[in-house]
Amino acid sequence: MRRSKLEMYIDILKVLARHGSLKLTHVMYKANVNCSVLKQSLDFLIQQGLVEEQFFSEKRNRRVVYAITERGRIVLRYFRELDIALQITGETSKIPALLY
């Protein structure tokens, strides 16, 4: 079953909250999102202030990693509370409590 954009955004935020700063390919594999969709999603999350790009220079290479912001963590908390309050799926929450 295909994920909605909201579910994809939440999955990306969860990955960054759980693993810290990650390169694009690491986010791609851990969130199970293809590269072009991930780039669009990260652009949106960056515009919303939920994710930030961090740049590092290593000799000749410039490395970019992505990290969740404090605002992104707050959004994850609100989403978890909403999921619990509404019991939308009748399943256990998809967002592990250890992130909060």
Predicted regions and their residues:
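Short amphipathic alpha-helical interaction segments
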Residues: 2, 33-47, 53
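Short acidic, hydrophobic short linear motifs in intrinsically disordered regions
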Residues: 21-30
